[in-house]
């Protein structure tokens, strides 16, 4: 039954190889959204890399704190959390914000994964919802907080845009 036996992937080498391909492919996903090989595409590529790295680092730190050692699978999962969380913001944030978003993604998605598995007893074998779903929601919210000065909640016209988005 659920929760009695941990079921990690059978071949972590292939998991890491697949994660590497996913990471490289995500550059095309985020930088390709700029539809031109210009500075915005380069920035999207940079922030994608930084967020994925920070997500992996944060997840690794959480495992180290809670279990005494990190796992390869955890580092890969943190990387995917960083990638998913930066996607909504990749065209509108700078490098420092990308690191904060990635670190936040690693920590929040780590706790979301544990909560969904252990408290809700939902068997999500690839942790799809806590990593991609929670990460995407978090990224959407953080995009509004950290995006450029023309668009951001704190520096742009965020309040009136928020009112407009809810039908006001």
Predicted segments with their positions:
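Glycine- and aromatic-enriched membrane alpha-helices
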Residues: 1-168
